[in-house]
């Protein structure tokens, strides 16, 4: 699988588009807002003389969420400046995603964004006719590598992106007295599960650790000393990588695929060969890589649960949510649409565009049945880091 080519959300404004099915991701951005505001306040307080701030949103995607994080950042800086008795700095904003992302959608949304910024911020440096401004640019490329000039950024944000890997993991194998890489042996699955071999678990963990180290090292070159990052992404609370919150959405999708294979609609060998470029890391893994890379200190690390539809969950409401059968099936369809908007471009090259409707109809039913007997949750990592130096 060429991850750079297929890792993008469903484009456009259709019923299966990411633009129409990204409420969960929007809620994850909102979940991290408090930590982001806190980090921005600390950044502004420690850089009182700075007149131009470099900001990057990594993995911005497309659709209504693509400018949500940046809007929040601009609003927070605008609200902080009067309290800190300082002028609003010039904001250099970079929106990043892979080249396959629908940047046309983002560009078409920018005039409305600029109008809102200018209309809301006149008199504080954002108005028309001069003064400090907000400049937005697109930067296509993988964040698993350098994207920006050295020490050009002050604040980096990323939401719902770092659980995606740079490539499908490979396993190590012995051949003629030498170690080689080989495809994973993960029969009947599309992600690690309780029945996956330990070699698959190890390969996924190693790929994430390698990618996250590269991500940190790349950002360490681009951020100024004292610069900050706020990252939110799917993770897990358990050391076990096969718990429900870290892998069960993939387990149910594999069930839908296998049901189609048994009916001869798709080939089972294609399921065996497909592995999702995804990993839900534990806090222990994150701390280990951050310490090993050595350029950042952890200011805050939180893990918050949300349900599969994107709703936040308090500790008091963590018990099973009772749903009627129609409610459960409706939830299953909403979750299926959300997952489809994200993973369909990955699945199509292997299984074919013509089976996608049938696949996600089955997936919706399977997820709906699961909602009837369970209340599945994701674990959202919210990580605030400070560049050392």
Swiss-Prot record:
The keyword Methyltransferase applies. It is found in: Cytoplasm; Nucleus. It is an enzyme of class 2 (transferase). One of its GO terms (biological process) is methylation. Signal peptide: none annotated. Binds 1 Mg(2+) ion per subunit. It holds the Pfam family Methyltransf_7. The record marks 157, 234, 353 as: Involved in substrate discrimination. Mg(2+) binds at residues 186, 272, 274-275. Induction: By wounding and methyl jasmonate treatment. Its EC number is 2.1.1.141. Keywords: Cytoplasm, Fatty acid biosynthesis, Fatty acid metabolism, Lipid biosynthesis, Lipid metabolism, Magnesium, Metal-binding, Methyltransferase, Nucleus, Oxylipin biosynthesis, S-adenosyl-L-methionine, Transferase. Its main location: cytoplasm. Expressed in rosettes, cauline leaves and developing flowers but not in young seedlings. S-adenosyl-L-homocysteine binds at residues 18, 60, 65, 97-98, 142-143. It catalyses: jasmonate + S-adenosyl-L-methionine = methyl (-)-jasmonate + S-adenosyl-L-homocysteine. Its cofactor is Mg(2+). Belongs to the methyltransferase superfamily. Type-7 methyltransferase family. Catalyzes the methylation of jasmonate into methyljasmonate, a plant volatile that acts as an important cellular regulator mediating diverse developmental processes and defense responses. This is Jasmonate O-methyltransferase. It comes from Arabidopsis thaliana (Mouse-ear cress).
């Amino acid at each position: 699988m060429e991850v750079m080519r297929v890792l993008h959300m469903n484009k456009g404004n259709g019923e299966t588009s990411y633009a129409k099915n990204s409420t969960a991701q929007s809620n994850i951005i909102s979940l991290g807002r408090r930590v982001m505001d806190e980090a921005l306040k600390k950044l502004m307080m420690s850089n009182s003389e700075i007149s131009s701030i470099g900001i990057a949103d990594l993995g911005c995607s497309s659709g209504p969420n693509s400018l949500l994080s940046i809007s929040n950042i601009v609003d927070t800086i605008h609200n902080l400046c009067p309290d800190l008795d300082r002028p609003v700095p010039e904001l250099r904003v970079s929106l990043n995603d892979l080249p396959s992302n629908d940047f046309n959608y983002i560009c078409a949304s920018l005039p409305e964004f600029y109008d809102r910024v200018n209309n809301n911020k006149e008199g504080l440096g954002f108005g028309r006719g001069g003064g400090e401004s907000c400049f937005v640019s697109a930067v296509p490329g993988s964040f698993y590598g350098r994207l920006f000039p050295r020490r050009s950024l002050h604040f980096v944000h990323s939401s719902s992106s770092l659980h995606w890997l740079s490539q499908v993991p490979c396993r190590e194998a012995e051949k003629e007295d030498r170690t080689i890489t080989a495809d994973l042996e993960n029969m009947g699955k599309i992600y690690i599960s309780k029945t996956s071999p330990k070699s698959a678990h190890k390969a996924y963990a190693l790929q994430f650790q390698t990618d996250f180290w590269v991500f940190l090292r790349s950002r360490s070159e681009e951020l100024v000393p004292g610069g900050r990052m706020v990252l939110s992404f799917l993770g897990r609370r358990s050391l076990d990588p096969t718990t429900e919150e870290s892998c069960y959405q993939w387990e149910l999708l594999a069930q839908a695929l296998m049901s189609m294979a048994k009916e001869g609609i798709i080939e089972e060998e294609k399921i065996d060969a497909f592995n999702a470029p995804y990993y839900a890391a534990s806090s222990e893994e994150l701390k280990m890589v951050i310490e090993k890379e050595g350029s950042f200190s952890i200011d805050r690390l939180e893990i918050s649960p949300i349900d599969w539809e994107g709703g936040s969950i308090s500790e008091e409401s963590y018990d099973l949510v009772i749903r009627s059968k129609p409610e459960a099936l409706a939830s299953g369809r909403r979750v299926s649409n959300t997952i489809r908007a994200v993973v369909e471009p990955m699945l199509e090259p292997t299984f074919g565009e013509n089976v996608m409707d049938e696949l996600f109809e089955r997936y919706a039913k399977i997820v709906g049945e699961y909602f009837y007997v369970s209340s599945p949750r994701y674990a959202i990592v919210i990580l605030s880091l400070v560049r050392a130096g």
